[in-house]
Amino acid sequence: MSIRAIIVDTAGTTTDLNFIQDVLFPYSRKAMAEFLEQNQHNVVVDYCISDVKDIALEPDATLERVTEILQQWIDEDRKLTPLKTLQGLIWKQGYNRVEFTGHIYPDFIDSIERIKEKGIRIYSFSSGSVEAQKLLFSHTEAGDLTGSFNGHFDTRTGNKLDKQAYCNICNTISLKPKQILFVSDVAEELKAAEAAGMTTCQMIRFADQRQAKCKKISSFSELVFD
């Protein structure tokens, strides 16, 4: 069965992990307190603040305490929707101020046209919010790449380590699992996608990565489609 859609992970696959860990995460951590103070009455931000209190089981937490919780979650790299939503909003601020540009590996950029010419749809699936993904792909040194994507998925679709998340994606894009190729650097994510029936491929950007039991590539240029 031929591949009709490719789903790409971001951090470690299309994007350098160091950009996420050394640029985006510290920026959101540093900006969190001021951002919450200035935007606490925004509907989305207010909802996230309430969600943080619920998850932390601290219904009476002050704004200062909520900030501390969020900063702790950043340090722990927690994949929680309110955190990821707030980070996306904060990063939008940074992108708009041109304080950084999104890092995308050149081999992915160079492969986009080839993939699209085959009639294959491109989606991204990340623990970062859909908003954050759009920001990443729209503020690159190669320009705005979002027009090449057919959609984006985040934690609202499910946990990336959970088979059900990939089943949900199949249902959303109306394709059979084997018609979808999932590319990620994380072995546990690939295992979950494989359990859902997807075709999988591991991106090896570094020699010390934990190896998955599937096809491996070190560049998107190595992908071959029928």
From Swiss-Prot:
Top-rank taxon: Bacteria
InterPro entries xrefs: Enolase-ppase_E1, HAD-like_sf, HAD-SF_hydro_IA, HAD_sf
This protein's pathway: Amino-acid biosynthesis; L-methionine biosynthesis via salvage pathway; L-methionine from S-methyl-5-thio-alpha-D-ribose 1-phosphate: step 3/6; Amino-acid biosynthesis; L-methionine biosynthesis via salvage pathway; L-methionine from S-methyl-5-thio-alpha-D-ribose 1-phosphate: step 4/6
GO biological process: L-methionine salvage from methylthioadenosine
E.C. number(s) listed in UniProt: 3.1.3.77
GO molecular function per UniProt: 2,3-diketo-5-methylthiopentyl-1-phosphate enolase activity; 2-hydroxy-3-keto-5-methylthiopentenyl-1-phosphate phosphatase activity; acireductone synthase activity; magnesium ion binding
Cofactor: record remark: Binds 1 Mg(2+) ion per subunit.
Reported cofactor(s): Mg(2+)
Keywords attached to this entry: Amino-acid biosynthesis, Hydrolase, Magnesium, Metal-binding, Methionine biosynthesis
Catalytic reaction equation(s): 5-methylsulfanyl-2,3-dioxopentyl phosphate + H2O = 1,2-dihydroxy-5-(methylsulfanyl)pent-1-en-3-one + phosphate
EC supergroup of this enzyme: hydrolase
Family of the protein in this entry: Belongs to the HAD-like hydrolase superfamily. MasA/MtnC family.
Matching PANTHER family: ENOLASE-PHOSPHATASE E1 (PTHR20371:SF1)
Function: Bifunctional enzyme that catalyzes the enolization of 2,3-diketo-5-methylthiopentyl-1-phosphate (DK-MTP-1-P) into the intermediate 2-hydroxy-3-keto-5-methylthiopentenyl-1-phosphate (HK-MTPenyl-1-P), which is then dephosphorylated to form the acireductone 1,2-dihydroxy-3-keto-5-methylthiopentene (DHK-MTPene).
Quaternary structure note: Monomer.
Name of this protein: Enolase-phosphatase E1
Organism: Shewanella frigidimarina (strain NCIMB 400)
Gene name per UniProt: mtnC
